[in-house]
């Protein structure tokens, strides 16, 4: 109903005649190397047999496409004739609050007995935000030797930076926690925000 654009949501503004700003210098060599590696020809994956449901936890913040990622996976499973169940824990996270989504894919719908992923049974952790990824809700679902984690390592300021301008982002400590819970062999960290901004002019495409 466009109520947010009419002033109901203070975070909404209307830009008339604006265009996305793209870096004038293009992609730096470091980013170019990362992009080249990411888009190298990939081997076909070994798909799970789905003797048990395949469980994915997606973490991020509101308004950045986390629920869209969840919906895309669910629709892909539906198109392939598989069973699927999703649960999105959003709370009040309309804009930049924590979001944790559960996606379960099974051979048949009857194979999925519950929507919520049990503790320690996540097969994949997609971390769109490092802070939310290290929360109890997300870390409680992973298991060393079972879970693979792909996490965006970009530093996104939290409310702590409003209260303390000198606050430091504990990137190393949070990455260490993910590696401790999942195992270093199962962790992959990329600066998806930087790559998306360099390629498309907007970090919203990082997810």
Regions found by a protein language model. Give the residues of each.
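Active-site cofactor/cluster-binding pocket
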Residues: 5, 10-207
């Amino acid at each position: 109903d466009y109520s947010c654009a009419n002033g109901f949501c203070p975070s909404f503004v209307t830009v008339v005649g604006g265009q996305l700003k793209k870096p004038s210098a293009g992609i730096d060599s470091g980013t170019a190397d990362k992009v080249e590696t990411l888009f190298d020809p990939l081997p076909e994956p070994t798909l799970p047999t789905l003797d048990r449901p395949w469980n994915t936890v997606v973490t991020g913040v509101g308004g950045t496409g986390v629920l869209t990622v969840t919906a895309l996976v669910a629709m892909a499973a539906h198109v392939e004739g598989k069973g699927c169940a999703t649960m999105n824990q959003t709370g009040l996270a309309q804009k930049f609050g924590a979001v944790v989504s559960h996606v379960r894919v099974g051979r048949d719908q009857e194979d999925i007995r519950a929507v919520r992923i049990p503790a320690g049974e996540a097969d994949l952790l997609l971390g769109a935000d490092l802070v939310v990824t290290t929360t109890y809700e997300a870390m409680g679902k992973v298991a060393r030797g079972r879970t693979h984690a792909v996490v965006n390592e970009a530093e996104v300021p939290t409310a702590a930076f409003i209260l303390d301008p000198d606050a430091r982002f504990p990137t190393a400590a949070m990455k260490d926690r993910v590696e401790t819970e999942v195992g270093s062999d199962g962790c992959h960290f990329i600066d998806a925000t930087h790559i998306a901004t360099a390629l498309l002019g907007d970090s919203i495409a990082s997810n």
